[in-house]
């Protein structure tokens, strides 16, 4: 019914059906939980539909609607959020309504405000989202500790990151005052002990993608031409980025990504065993938007490209420490080794002058391809992938015949599932 009402509203609201939105708002703020929930659901679909209209007159009408809708919906969201925190036993209904209210506010703030931070209500929403998200994470942990379902709390927490990401993408210059709190919030929860017990995969992906979006935002890059005009917001955004990504935070983030996120998990190994071809192809396309491993890899590459001078020594030190340890078929050591090799492969173009790949290949990598222990398959696969990454960067022609023989031997001498995975990983 809510979707049907929204489809009618697309053509009739607000001109032919002016009472629709005021009626929904009044029911939303009422005392009947079920009626309030249904009104919020309908309002969400109506706002979502109206926000998708692109004609100038429709955009103007939606901006006017946003100015009238933001205050009551914001007040309802704040009330429902507080109710969910104060009554955890009854949090399910409160959380569902708070989530619907926040989804509506997300559309209003992103698509209904020309500059969100110039609207007092939109500014309140965005600045409050950091603390509200932290509270949602705490509520999720409390629900899990009590043995209760926490799926709604997870969706609610993730929605806060989507609000920030959409605002950054649609209004990058208006987002400048939020860059610092966004980076601090994401880094503290993902890369420090404060996030222990609070994180889950979708939220972690949302935080990492926010950091990457700030790094890669075109509007936050100063012009290369010294004579080009410089927007004050652009220069301020660049200053905030450079101040935040100092040497110590960068080193901490780099090490954490490689040691905590890059190693394969038990689930990864199970997926590999179940369907090798599917496993090596699942990280393609835009998997970084939703999956943790490709998300962390994309962030690592973005960090390395922008801060190569600071991060190259860190990664080289990790590589030296890894190579100082003899190859071991013990699974945990093999996984740690594979993670470092993965990082070196992703940074191949940035490490051209730093790594003697020919020497490394002859003194270690080719010998590692000959290790047949089942646990060492993760390193063998990564070595083949690593050679594929470096072959177009820095590999002597005289070594290629030996490389071909070693790779062929590594692929053909193992079981069918592992062999197909090794064969496919050359294109990963």
Specify the residue positions occupied by each region the protein language model found.
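Residue-level detector of extended alpha-helical repeat arrays and alpha-solenoid scaffolds
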Residues: 36, 94, 98, 153, ...
């Amino acid at each position: 019914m809510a979707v049907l009402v929204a489809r009618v509203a697309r053509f009739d609201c607000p001109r032919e059906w002016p009472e629709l939105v005021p009626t929904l708002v009044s029911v939303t703020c009422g005392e009947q939980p079920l009626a309030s929930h249904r009104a919020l659901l309908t309002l969400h679909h109506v706002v979502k539909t109206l926000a998708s209209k692109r004609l100038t007159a429709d955009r103007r009408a939606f901006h006017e609607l946003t100015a009238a809708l933001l205050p009551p919906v914001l007040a309802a969201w704040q009330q429902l959020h507080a109710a969910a925190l104060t009554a955890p036993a009854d949090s399910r209904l409160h959380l569902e309504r708070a989530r619907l209210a926040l989804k509506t506010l997300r559309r209003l703030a992103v698509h209904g405000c020309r500059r969100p931070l110039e609207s007092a209500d939109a500014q309140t929403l965005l600045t409050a989202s950091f603390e509200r998200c932290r509270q949602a994470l705490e509520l999720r942990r409390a629900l899990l500790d009590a043995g209760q379902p926490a799926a709604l709390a997870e969706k609610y927490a993730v929605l806060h990151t989507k609000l920030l990401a959409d605002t950054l993408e649609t209004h990058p210059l208006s987002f400048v005052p939020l860059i610092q709190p966004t980076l601090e919030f994401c880094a503290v929860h993902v890369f420090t002990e404060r996030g222990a017990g609070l994180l889950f995969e979708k939220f972690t992906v949302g935080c990492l993608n926010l950091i990457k979006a700030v790094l890669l935002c075109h509007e936050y890059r100063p012009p290369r031409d010294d004579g080009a005009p410089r927007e004050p917001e652009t220069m301020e955004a660049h200053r905030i980025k450079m101040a935040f990504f100092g040497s110590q935070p960068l080193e901490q983030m780099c090490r954490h990504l490689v040691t905590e996120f890059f190693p394969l998990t038990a689930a990864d190994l199970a997926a590999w065993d179940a369907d090798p071809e599917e496993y090596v192809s699942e990280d393609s396309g835009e998997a970084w938007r939703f999956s943790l491993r490709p998300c962390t890899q994309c962030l690592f590459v973005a960090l390395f490209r922008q801060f190569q001078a600071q991060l190259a020594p860190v990664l080289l030190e990790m590589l030296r420490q890894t190579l100082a340890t003899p190859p071991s078929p013990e699974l945990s050591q093999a996984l740690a080794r594979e993670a470092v090799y993965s990082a070196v492969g992703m940074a191949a173009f940035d490490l051209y002058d730093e790594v003697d790949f020919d020497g490394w290949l002859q003194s270690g990598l080719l010998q590692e391809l000959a290790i047949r222990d089942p646990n060492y398959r993760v390193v063998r696969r990564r070595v083949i992938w690593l050679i594929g990454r470096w072959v177009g960067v820095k590999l002597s022609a005289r070594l290629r015949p030996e490389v071909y023989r070693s790779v062929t031997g590594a692929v053909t001498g193992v079981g069918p599932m592992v062999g197909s995975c090794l064969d496919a990983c050359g294109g990963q």
